[in-house]
């Protein structure tokens, strides 16, 4: 999938699009750097000997979000000199607010700072009510719903007083800014192409941002695999990729990447059989030109040491 996206970017550049008008979104800094390197290698082999200037708008959703927020801060009532809290700093601030409310003592048995931050983060990224998030994901915290609501309100106020944003705010504030039609159009018009890697891992906020930037889908390319959506516990929403084509009129074109380069056909046969059970999915039949007569084995081991010993012995 990633190689497909890199070739797409290289093709766009080869067709004359300036790299500064390409927005490429990934889920890690390392993935963004790898994407840049792949694009450069592909263009270096081009018959015209093309080279690409630095893809200045390639990065994670959060990094790009921070950059846009600093640039458009005054348009949305934000101080551009805001500081960014990492997860540890955010948890410490949450704990400070817990302490002010008298909820940090062992006797209170109130959720830990890490759990509180996880609940808050889930409500923001999943765009779900607190009650729903607690009931479905953190049911052991149901008795504390009112206290959590007060805590989160105070946490937000503390961030505003200190002119700082946490990682979730980097998405939330951009999504809110892009809900202003003229601002979304202005930002969207800066990019002829927006490309997203691992789209099955996006959450509701990220999908909102993309659809606001390119509401008609022009120049929008996403790559992903609905069968690899395994980050629901981090608020990833598989419906983002399943519903992507129908957001547009006419519907987005779906290109199926059915060839697998890593596995042998017996492994893919097993994978195809499992994937076929899904009630809703994009139809694809994975295949490989790597033949093998050996079928996958189901092996039961006692622990990780036994597992490692078995694998090493093979």
Mark where each language-model region is.
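Conserved, well-folded catalytic cores of nucleic-acid-processing
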Residues: 12, 38, 42-45, 71, ...
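Short, basic/glycine-rich phosphate-binding loops at helix/coil junctions
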Residues: 70-72, 151-152, 287-294
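P-loop NTPase Walker
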Residues: 1-80, 84-85, 91, 185, ...
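Short loop/turn elements that form and flank the Walker-type P-loop nucleotide-binding site
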Residues: 18-19, 52, 188-190, 215-217, ...
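Conserved RecA-like helicase ATPase core segment
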Residues: 10-11, 204-309, 313
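ATP-hydrolysis module of ASCE/P-loop NTPase motor domains
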Residues: 52-55, 73-168, 191, 254-261, ...
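Conserved helicase NTPase motor core
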Residues: 1, 23-24, 31-32, 57, ...
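Generic recognition of well-ordered alpha-helical segments
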Residues: 7, 37, 41, 63, ...
């Amino acid at each position: 999938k990633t190689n497909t996206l890199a070739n797409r970017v290289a093709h766009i550049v080869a067709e004359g699009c300036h790299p500064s008008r390409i927005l490429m979104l990934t889920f890690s800094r390392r993935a963004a750097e790898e994407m840049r390197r792949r694009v450069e290698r592909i263009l270096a082999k081009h018959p015209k000997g093309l080279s690409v200037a630095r893809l200045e708008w390639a990065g994670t959703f959060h990094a790009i979000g921070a950059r846009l927020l600093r640039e458009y801060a005054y348009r949305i009532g934000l101080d551009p000199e805001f500081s960014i809290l990492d997860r540890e700093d955010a948890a410490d601030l949450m704990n400070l607010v817990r302490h002010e409310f008298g909820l940090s003592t062992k006797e209170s048995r109130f959720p830990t700072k890490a759990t509180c931050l996880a609940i808050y983060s889930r409500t923001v990224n999943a765009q779900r009510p607190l009650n729903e998030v607690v009931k479905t994901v953190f049911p052991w915290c149901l008795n504390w719903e009112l206290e959590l609501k007060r805590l989160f309100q105070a946490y937000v106020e503390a961030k505003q007083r200190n002119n700082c944003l946490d990682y979730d705010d980097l998405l939330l504030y951009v999504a809110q800014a892009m809900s202003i039609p003229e601002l979304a159009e202005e930002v969207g018009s800066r990019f002829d192409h927006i490309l997203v890697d691992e789209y099955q891992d996006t959450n509701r906020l990220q999908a909102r941002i993309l659809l606001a930037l390119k509401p008609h889908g022009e120049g929008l390319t996403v790559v992903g695999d609905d069968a690899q959506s395994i980050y629901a516990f981090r608020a990833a929403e598989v419906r983002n990729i399943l519903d992507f084509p129908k957001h547009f009129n006419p519907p987005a074109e779906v290109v199926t990447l059915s060839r697998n380069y890593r596995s042998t056909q017996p492994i893919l046969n097993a994978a195809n059989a499992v994937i076929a059970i899904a009630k809703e999915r994009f139809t694809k039949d994975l295949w490989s030109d790597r033949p093998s007569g050996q079928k996958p084995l189901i092996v039961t081991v006692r622990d990780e040491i036994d597992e490692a010993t078995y694998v090493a012995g093979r």
